[in-house]
Amino acid sequence: MKKILEAILAINLAVLSCIVFINIILRYGFQTSILSVDELSRYLFVWLTFIGAIVAFMDNAHVQVTFLVEKLSPAWQRRVALVTHSLILFICGALAWGATLKTIQDWSDYSPILGLPIGLMYAACLPTSLVIAFFELRHLYQLITRSNSLTSPPQGA
């Protein structure tokens, strides 16, 4: 799954870079531009960000503040990990719910140039929150079933 997401990110970034570069050349070199590039780049950037968040989560690359947790005993580290993963799971659920509502609400509104549904931008949040929630459920399961687990399992493992 990670390789597929990385390939999607690479294609997205390549398309985004090319269309913006071409539009810059056209705008400053020939005093014209492709109007749809601005809208398309917004959509691509939003999806790039949310798919990138999934890959970063799988790589355990998100910012973590661990200096306090590392000073705790293994039993307390496990308790804090349970609370942390539970909170992340709750936030993913809230994010998925809100993204679904906003996507449905704005699906009938269309962008002025491309005519794409505005809800398509909000829809990018849904797969991100669901995939991260899946990993969090797995982490919670591993923490609960491992009686001698000292620390939280790796994020993307």
Swiss-Prot record:
Residues 1-6, 67-78, 136-157 are cytoplasmic. The chain crosses the membrane at residues 7-29, 44-66, 79-98, 113-135. It comes from the Bacteria. Keywords: Cell inner membrane, Cell membrane, Membrane, Transmembrane, Transmembrane helix, Transport. The keyword Glycosyltransferase does not apply. Residues 30-43, 99-112 are periplasmic. It is found in: Cell inner membrane. It is a multi-pass membrane protein. The keyword Repeat does not apply. GO terms for biological process: C4-dicarboxylate transport; carbohydrate transmembrane transport; cellular response to salt; regulation of single-species biofilm formation. GO terms for cellular component: membrane; plasma membrane; tripartite ATP-independent periplasmic transporter complex. The complex comprises the extracytoplasmic solute receptor protein YiaO, and the two transmembrane proteins YiaM and YiaN. Belongs to the TRAP transporter small permease family. Part of the tripartite ATP-independent periplasmic (TRAP) transport system YiaMNO involved in the uptake of 2,3-diketo-L-gulonate. This is 2,3-diketo-L-gulonate TRAP transporter small permease protein YiaM. It comes from Escherichia coli (strain K12).
